[in-house]
From Swiss-Prot:
Protein name (Swiss-Prot/TrEMBL): Hypoxanthine-guanine phosphoribosyltransferase
Positions bound to GMP: K134, F155, L156, D162
UniProt gene name: hpt
Species in which this protein is naturally found: Aquifex aeolicus (strain VF5)
Domain of life where this protein originates: Bacteria
A GO MF term: hypoxanthine phosphoribosyltransferase activity
Claim: Glycosyltransferase is one of the keywords in the record: yes
BP GO annotations: GMP salvage; guanine salvage; hypoxanthine metabolic process; IMP salvage; purine ribonucleoside salvage
InterPro entries: HGPRT (IPR050408), Hxn_phspho_trans (IPR005904), PRibTrfase_dom (IPR000836), PRTase-like (IPR029057)
UniProt pathway: Purine metabolism; IMP biosynthesis via salvage pathway; IMP from hypoxanthine: step 1/1; Purine metabolism; GMP biosynthesis via salvage pathway; GMP from guanine: step 1/1
Keywords: Cytoplasm, Glycosyltransferase, Magnesium, Metal-binding, Nucleotide-binding, Purine salvage, Transferase
Length: 178
């Protein structure tokens, strides 16, 4: 059994199930945009980068890729609730069709705040996609337009999600056991 930082890991999502769902999501997303020009896919670093890389490679069309980095976790296992933009967009998204991508939606605070921030930049369309959704942790009324998997309220690692930088590179998603 795998362990991180002295805690056992229990498999939640297998690599093949993740790959299948990412391809399905790409098709769903593709059908929801006009594609008059490539959409701008904005990934939230660091957690979303693996999901985002697989997602954009599953599209049958060209996309522009942008990154933002926000901080709300620190080194713990719970969100601090304070959101800080560490890296902003390099590209102007005014009048563009945009997809905001993150690894996990739990309280909704980060996604809602970044979504509202991006709306101020006047995109033509702004939709959201998350790899994982912990609906039972929601503190604000915010739901993603596209969701990979709904997951239980457990601390998760793998496929981009980490615990103090550990576990991000795992190809599956695991629950950290108490």
């Amino acid at each position: 059994m795998k362990e991180i930082r002295g805690k056992k890991l229990k498999l939640l999502l297998k690599e093949e199930d993740i790959k299948r769902r990412v391809k399905e999501l790409a098709k769903e997303i593709e059908s929801s945009y006009s594609w008059e020009e490539p959409i701008v896919v904005v990934g939230l670093l660091k957690g979303a980068f693996i999901f985002l890389a697989d997602l954009v490679r599953a599209f049958d069309r060209f996309v522009f890729v942008e990154f933002m980095q926000v901080s709300s976790y620190g080194k713990g296992m719970k969100s601090s609730g304070t959101i800080k933009i560490v890296k902003d967009l390099d590209m102007d998204i005014e009048g563009k069709e945009v997809l905001l991508v993150d690894d996990i939606l739990d309280t909704g605070l980060t996604m809602k705040e970044i979504h509202d921030y991006l709306l101020m930049k006047k995109p033509k369309v702004l939709k959201t996609c998350v790899f994982l959704d912990k609906k039972e942790r929601r503190k604000v009324d915010f739901n993603a337009d596209f969701v990979g998997f709904e997951v239980p309220d457990k601390f998760l690692v793998g496929y981009g999600l980490d615990w103090g930088e550990y576990g991000r590179n795992l190809p599956e998603v695991y629950m950290v056991e108490d």
